[in-house]
Amino acid sequence: PTLSLTQDSALPYNFQFNAANNVEVRRAEVNAYIQANVVRDMIMQYAPTHPVIPGQTEFRVNVAVSGTCNAFYDGSSINFYNSGGGCANTAFYDVVHHEYGHHVVATGGSGQGQYGEGMSDCMGVLLSDQPILGFGFQNNCNAGIRSANNTLQYPCSQAIHTCGQLISGCLWDTRNELVNAGVSNYRDLLKLWCLNSVRLHRGDLIAPNITIDWLVLDDNDANLNNGTPHYQYINAGFSRHNMPGPAIVGLDFSFPDGLPTNLAPDRTNTIRFDVLPLAAQPEPNSGRIGYRVNGGAVSYVTATQIAPNQYTVDLPPIACNQRVDYFFTARAQDNSNWSSPAGAPTAAYAAVTNYEPTPVRLADNFQTNLGWAVTNGTGLTAGSWQRAI
């Protein structure tokens, strides 16, 4: 069929497709055409650098394909079945979104499998802002065929359509975290993260590296250690499916003079360290050093703040030939505690108390003339130095 309209070029006009709306195949054609373009338009708006799709001017959308109760993507077209076998005509909203989603995944560089099924389900979730895929697919408008509102856990080894719900579940739970926090532009954020993450993914599995991809897309300072603007919501949503993001670091420690591995015995040893803000702000005057000798009990010494976030600390005298494990702590203004190394006091830096060897000022094996001259003192009668080879 064709559709034509005569118009004044200066005025906007709208084409009306399928005005009668009384023929299943015509309705399927219109639905499939419009809904495929809805997904494409979403890609164009939120992921304009996605490969292929922005410049693709022709893509086959086939309806009335022989069969019932299914639809498919074959790499160059999306295809939909007529009604029958207890199912509706499959060319309708989120089923079309799903099949075009396979095209998004393929052009983005990933395999299909569980990832392709799940990410394709996400297209419908992003557009409808509800978790059920395929309301009415089986002629029941109160039920669908899959749901993003699920408790599926990573790793998943079930059928690919089942495991695909792992990523749609992460999307839906992240959505709920944003909504509950009152983030008004949550739909825009979800589309940005989800659609652009496709280009970062490879393979056909759903794994926690996807969480990192979302965080990278949300990040604003090229440092995931201090979190991202929406870290708490993304991490919470993905954690519900056993795909947490990397732990953020509140405070960072640096050591202007380095970390000693040799401490002078029987006297005070002074160490400098700085406490730097990452995801949190340092609490002034909260720096300390903890240490233990030969695996004994941990003792603490409060450091002296010599400038904002800069400290010196004096380790008390320790006898010679002792192993000293030590670490640094500080408190953030949100009352969280941080240490260097992470995991202290179990993890610690190590040093020994020992006298440093006397530095060598000159080495001469007397086999080569290094240009020294020997002058014997007045009255010397024997034992003068001579270089001999």
Each model region followed by its residue ranges:
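Glycine-centered loop-to-beta-strand initiation motif
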Residues: 1-3, 13-15, 307-311
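Glycan-association/targeting regions that enable binding to alpha-glucans and other polysaccharides
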Residues: 234-389
